[in-house]
Amino acid sequence: MAIRTILRYPDKRLREPTSPVTRFDAALESLVQDMAETMYAAPGVGLAAPQIGVLLHLFIIDVAMGEDQPSELRTFINPEILEAVGDVRNEEGCLSFPGVHEEIRRAERVRVRAQDAHGAFFELEADGLLAIAIQHEHDHLIGRLMVDHLSLLRRRLVHRAMVKRAAADTAVI
């Protein structure tokens, strides 16, 4: 297992399209383990493969992260949101936008169909933080980012702040 580098906005690779996972093998299991180690080290509640530069239709979530609950790591491979119901606003952060937290509108409940790390299909109905995390991570798989849910003004402000931070990070190296 290894901790991978998380791409930060405005890295263009975060917008690239992903491909379906077609091989369920030891390499995929290793990737999922690396993603989990990376997510927990960050720390975060979710991580999509494109956030570490892997353009596959895959994300992981553990909404118990940081709470007094046992870990409940979930792997979603080739996920498809079948149903999205209701409306909720919630403050979200993103590992690709360190330090940024914005109020985002999402569906209150979702039903998703995906595969696990062994290729078995499953369906899951989710609400609360899990539903929000599923939608957030699924967005990464289609090149949609947290800022895309913001007003044009907020998007520009966040963009400027992240570009400035990226320049400062580069100057330090």
Residue ranges and their predicted role:
Residues 1-173:
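Positively charged
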